[in-house]
Amino acid sequence: DIAGLIRGASRGEGLGNRFLANIRETDAIVHVVRAHGDEGVVHPDGRVDPAADIEIVETELIYADLEQAERRLERVERQARGGDRVAIAEEAWLRELIDALRAGRPARTVPPPADAPRALAALAQLSAKPVLFVANVDEGSDVEPDAVAAHARDQGAVAIAVSARLEAELAELGSDEAVAMRAELGVGESGLKRVVDGAFSLLDLIAFFTAGEDAPAQSLHMRRGLSAWHAAGKVHTDMQRGFARAEVIGWEELVDAGGYIAARERGTLRLEGRDYVVADGDVVTIKFSA
């Protein structure tokens, strides 16, 4: 959770350097943008302009990336002059990247070439990270403002709308009351679910469950397209090392059957090998040798 960046953060203004260092460690950025008109919440600039707020943060990320890319270019130029083919490819990309950053375009618009794999690790660019824009809207609205939606489309990002005030009020209610209030206001899914779904989509993640007839269920996540062997490693390295097979069933099938015994009788519980690609919502029981 990182407080809003101010102008000059890339030069160390406020707590800029600390905030930027924190952002550098993340897989993605969830950028919460004010889009509500509550006069009781003071804006530092005395206005409500989500597009301008987005620009302030993105500009600081771009400035930080530009400074780092220019320093990196100085080192790579020396290696390229020595005939290092990887450095030559990276130098060309860095020059293209620097031109884009100087023009105000984020690093995610200039992906590195396949033959310069060390570039991304060396730079850890802030503006290359995938972004989920969360427009904090007035109560009763679940549509992101046009300015936020348009900016997300231009940047290849994802945008959703959440009313933080409404979510705080609903959190104080019982589940049935909360559902009734959402229906009355015309607001569908909870804000938390929309944020989680947006983040999973942005990072191309799936959720799977580990459970057994005598084991508690837990939810885990991993990149889409990974195998049962990778899923075993998410649970415990011993399971991955001694992987034998996996019992797999979709969670809806398991709920519909009413449990493992009935699912096995129906034939919906299946055995899969290490290369089985785990699907979103799978319930996986790892069989392994110690």
Please annotate each region the language model reported.
Residues 2-31, 36-59, 111-123:
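Switch II of P-loop NTPase G domains
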Residues 3-6, 34-40, 47-51, 62-63, ...:
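Conserved nucleotide-binding/hydrolysis micro-motifs of P-loop NTPases
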Residues 55-67, 71:
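Internal, well-ordered alpha/beta segment that forms a basic, Gly-enriched binding/recognition surface
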Residues 70-290:
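C-terminal-of-GTPase-core extension/linker across diverse P-loop GTPases
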